[in-house]
């Protein structure tokens, strides 16, 4: 929800900072790596029970996550490779943060509550996969109640007010499940209505090319056999 409505606005507002970092010699990949390192530190701190410090590190983790795109645009190095690295780092950051929460619960809350952040992580990965797969099919799966920005904000509230952490995790789980259903339904409708999508046209073109190549190979084979059969 916030990713779709505000991400482009935030990116544009951070372009001047991205230019300054580029002039200082900072690359977008370096910013992304810093974000991963900070997420790993936050994971350890949360796992050890320092939730307020974990909250601070979680907030700081959002800084490089917001800046890597503007730095890439300012330096003119925005590329599929960078987009891939950024997407992978986002999933890794999610796993580190929720893994830290699971570690904390394993040591302080006996029972099955440790599975709560694990379930949230599974749903967050499913939500991300839905978008990636939909985009590979030239469909749109953006949107939903609990996108990545919302997960960051709600988890930060849970770390800041530790007595409400379990309630916050349940809220994240429910909203993530709703988001997964929303995205599934959205893509399902598009796939049902759009009979001639760019993906389908490319797939048809690939099939046509395969048929043409097989026909060419057969023609070459027939021509070669005719040459071999000629009397010398």
Residue ranges, per PLM feature:
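Helix-loop junctions at the membrane-solvent interface of multi-pass transporters
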Residues: 25, 42-49, 100, 161
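Ser/Thr-centric signal marking residues that sit
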Residues: 29-32, 179
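Membrane-embedded alpha-helical segments that form the functional core of polytopic membrane enzymes
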Residues: 32-81, 113-122, 166-175
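A feature for the membrane-embedded catalytic helix bundles of lipid/isoprenoid biosynthetic enzymes
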Residues: 2-18, 87-232
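Membrane interfacial helix-start motif at the N-side
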Residues: 21-26, 82
């Amino acid at each position: 929800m916030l990713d779709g409505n505000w991400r482009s606005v935030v990116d544009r507002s951070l372009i001047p900072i991205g230019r300054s970092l580029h002039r200082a010699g900072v690359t977008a990949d370096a910013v992304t790596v810093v974000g991963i390192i900070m997420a790993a530190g936050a994971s350890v701190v949360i796992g050890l029970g320092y939730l307020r410090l974990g909250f601070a590190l979680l907030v700081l983790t959002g800084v490089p996550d917001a800046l890597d795109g503007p730095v890439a645009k300012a330096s003119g190095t925005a590329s599929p490779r960078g987009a891939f690295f950024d997407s992978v780092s986002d999933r890794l950051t999610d796993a580190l943060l929720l893994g830290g929460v699971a570690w904390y619960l394993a040591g302080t809350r006996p029972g099955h509550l440790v599975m709560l952040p694990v379930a949230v992580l599974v749903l967050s990965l499913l939500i991300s996969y839905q978008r990636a797969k939909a985009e590979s099919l030239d469909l749109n799966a953006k949107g939903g109640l609990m996108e990545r920005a919302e997960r960051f904000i709600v988890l930060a509230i849970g770390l800041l007010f530790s007595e409400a952490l379990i309630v916050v995790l349940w809220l994240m789980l429910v909203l993530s499940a709703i988001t997964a259903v929303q995205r599934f339904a959205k893509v399902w409708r598009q796939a049902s209505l759009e009979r001639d999508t760019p993906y389908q046209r490319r797939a048809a073109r690939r099939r046509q090319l395969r048929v043409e190549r097989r026909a060419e190979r057969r023609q070459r084979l027939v021509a070669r056999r005719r040459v071999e059969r000629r009397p010398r």
